[in-house]
Every structure is written in C-alpha cells, then in structure tokens.
C-alpha cells in the first residue's frame, strides 16, 4: 500500500463577499488530492481536502517541501501497525522532517490541508465515515449523541 501521488491546485473562490477590513474577490484556496494505490470499483482511493475560505492557496510550500517528503518516504514507514492503512501521524512526521522548531504559522495551513486529505483517504480505505474513524482512534469508539 502506498501513496502514488499528491496533487495540489489553486482555485479562485470567485466570491464577492466583503466586510470593513477584507474582501474575498482575489481569494484563492488550495485543493489537494492524496492518491493511493488502493483500488475500489476500478479507481484509486483518493482523499481530498481544501485549505480554507479565509486563507490564500499555499501550494508552493506543499510542492517544494511537504509533498516530496511524503512521496520519497519508504511506503511501509507511512502505514499503521497493522499495515492495512496509512497512519496520519507517521505522514505528519514525514512532512515535519528537517523543519525547524517553531515557525508553525508559515506551514500550518499547507501541512493541515494535506493531513485532512490523508484522513479522508484513511476513512475511505477503512470503508467507514471519517467521524467514526476519528471516534475509534481518539474517543474509544464512542460517537457523541450530538455535536452542539
């Protein structure tokens, strides 16, 4: 099991929203696809994410540093202990290799967007909704009765 490609593209939001300090007319967002070699219905399982409607696209850092680090890693080093799925924490650790301590604001959106796409792929490979995968991983499998 391996990640075969990670693609990022910037798209304009094309929004006319504005307030007294900011407008979105030039705002862009990064859209990411994490493409795996796991096949479902004849197509590779892919995880998707976008960065935010309040942040500009951040693909330069993704393409220069974070995507190459993931794609050049030993594929087995990115898997969970069972070897049946990816481990988002291990992928995060690969992205953070050779990054200096601190300075997280510059990279947080780029890394976070890739990480969300990885989680989406993990849930699809597991054949479960992402909220269930997260509950199993971080809340002893307990789903909240309500969110708010």
Q: What are the functions of these language-model segments?
A:
Residues 1, 8-13, 95-97, 110-116, ...:
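Generic detector of short, locally flexible boundary/turn motifs and exposed helical patches
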Residues 1-59, 65:
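Structured beta-strand/loop patches that form or line metal/cofactor-binding pockets in enzymes
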Residues 12-22, 58, 100-102, 139-148:
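Proteins with a high burden of low-complexity, intrinsically disordered sequence enriched in S/T/G/P/A and R
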Residues 24-27, 34, 70, 135, ...:
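Short, surface-exposed, charged/polar-biased interaction segments
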Residues 29-31, 113, 146-148:
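Broad gene-expression machinery/nucleic-acid interaction feature
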Residues 39-126, 136:
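Metal- or metallocofactor-binding catalytic centers and their adjacent structured scaffolds
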Residues 122-148:
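Catalytic pocket of metal/acid-base enzymes, prominently hydrolases
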């Amino acid at each position: 099991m391996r990640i075969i490609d990670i693609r990022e593209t910037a798209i304009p939001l094309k929004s006319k929203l504005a307030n007294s300090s900011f407008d979105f007319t030039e705002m862009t967002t990064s859209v990411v696809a994490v493409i795996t070699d796991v096949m479902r219905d004849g197509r590779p399982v892919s995880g998707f994410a976008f960065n935010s409607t309040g942040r500009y696209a951040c693909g330069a850092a993704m393409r220069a540093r974070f995507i190459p680090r993931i794609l050049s890693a030993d594929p087995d080093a990115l898997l969970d202990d069972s070897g049946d799925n990816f481990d988002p924490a291990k992928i995060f650790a690969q992205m953070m290799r050779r990054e200096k301590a601190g300075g997280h604001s510059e990279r947080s959106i780029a890394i976070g967007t890739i990480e969300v796409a990885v989680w989406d792929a993990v849930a699809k490979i597991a054949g479960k909704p992402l909220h269930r995968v997260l509950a199993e991983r971080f809340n002893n499998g307990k789903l909240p009765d309500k969110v708010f």
